[in-house]
Amino acid sequence: MGFFSSTQPPRPATVPSDEIIPLHFWNTALCMRGTVLDISLKFDDVLDTSKLRSALEELLEMKDWRQLGARLRMNPNGRLEYHIPTRFDASRPAFAMTNAQHETSIADHPLGARIPHATSTPAIFPSPDVLSPLLRSEDAPKNIDDWICSDRPQLSIHIITFSDATLITVTWLHTLTDVMGMALILNAWTALLRGNREAVPKLQGFRLDPLTELGQRTPAEKYMHFNRVFGRKEFWWFIGLNVLDRLWYRQEERRTICIPAASLRNLCQQSSSEICASRGKEEPVPFVSESDVLLGWWVRSLYSALGLRTDQTILVNNALNLRTSLHESFTSNNSAYMGNALCMSPTFLRGHQVADEPLGQIALRIRESVTEQRTPEQVEAMTALQMQTMEQTGYLALVGDPRMMLLSCSNWHKARLFDIDFSSAVLQSSGPSSLQNPQHTGKPCYVNGVQHSANSFRNVLSVIGKDAGGNWWLTGVLRTDAWTHIEKQLHKLGSS
């Protein structure tokens, strides 16, 4: 059963001694309630599970961090609350941790051998979901009912050890935090593994939410795309067209992509040359990031793969991290924001632009659009708009036109998951990168990301990040027939 089920199991009684904190509006959106996230880290090292447990126990006993051990409840009014135990013990632990131990090499395990690895040419791998029987424990939560109808803590961690590798999977409901917030948890965990308590920041986001103040500074009407915000008619028109698309193209797949460092370097050089060619000799060359170039390549590939029209609006929605957009609103030198702190930054393109313009120009359009929308005034106006829409509908606001093609991107690379350092828990290293460069010891060589939801993630791209070798990892969900074209584009990229 899930959030939209008509019947639910009985819910546990309230523990009188628990501290009760209502969830803030940003974390209660229907899309947050309906999504469970898994992040799995693969290490070419054997890690000490007892050290991992002890450090995480220490973290969740620290004053502000105890809130992560809260139980999720829904009150009689249908509102979500955190119930924080006064103390954690074996009957009510701060987190759930399970272990599976294999005495063999990970290469000898039928699923372990299928974990993607870096390649010399662009490659596409099966859905990351196929690894779930290995990466998740049997009782790992899959929907909101698994929290509100039990006394389960917010974090579920499953650790799988082999003779030459370790896998760590963290599972949580999106109401708790986004991927950037999970990176804060992982980095605080590893800081305590090193014995560095001073590196653990204080947490904001549970009792007081700076997003509420952020949404009251600037009126929503000052948002640059306010005149394109969907009303009720446009919203249901857009939903109806998307339902028809899913009825016509019923099959969809999530796949993992590896873009080798050399291939992306060629794409970036191509983009830079194209941007330079379009400007005068005296004009400075504008900045575009590797992520901009990757997203531009993805949009161009989907234009053909999905059979889009030249006159069609294509909305590229980039997830904008509010933590970095407005530093003074969220963090001081010793504090960090825990929760969902995202706005979508739309870039409007026309089909003919994607078809006719060079890759560099598309990447530049994406970069310029993001830059325009991350000013304090625009972020504040976007936040005000989302607050108003959430209060009225429970949904996040949409902009554009109902007939547009919506392509969304979540850039996990900003969380630097491949840089998280568990080296203080390493018992034995076996990976080639660790042997060649000790700085890679205890850092993930692969990151697996999966969203569990009754909702479709079609046309959503997650940029997982860049590994130690400079290779980029992506996961995307597309209708099944579109992946054939993506494979051709990857082959073309590898041949250039």
Curated annotation (Swiss-Prot):
GO terms for biological process: terpenoid biosynthetic process. Its EC number is 2.3.1.-. Pfam families: Transferase. It comes from the Eukaryota. The keyword Acyltransferase applies. Pathway: Secondary metabolite biosynthesis; terpenoid biosynthesis. Keywords: Acyltransferase, Transferase. The keyword Transferase applies. Disruption phenotype: Drastically reduces the production of andrastin A. The active site is at H174 (proton acceptor), D421 (proton acceptor). GO terms for molecular function: acyltransferase activity. Monomer. Acetyltransferase; part of the gene cluster that mediates the biosynthesis of andrastins, meroterpenoid compounds that exhibit inhibitory activity against ras farnesyltransferase, suggesting that they could be promising leads for antitumor agents. The first step of the pathway is the synthesis of 3,5-dimethylorsellinic acid (DMOA) by the polyketide synthase adrD via condensation of one acetyl-CoA starter unit with 3 malonyl-CoA units and 2 methylations. DMAO is then converted to farnesyl-DMAO by the prenyltransferase adrG. PANTHER family: FAMILY REGULATORY PROTEIN, PUTATIVE (AFU_ORTHOLOGUE AFUA_3G14730)-RELATED (PTHR31896:SF69). Belongs to the plant acyltransferase family. This is Acetyltransferase adrJ. The gene is adrJ.
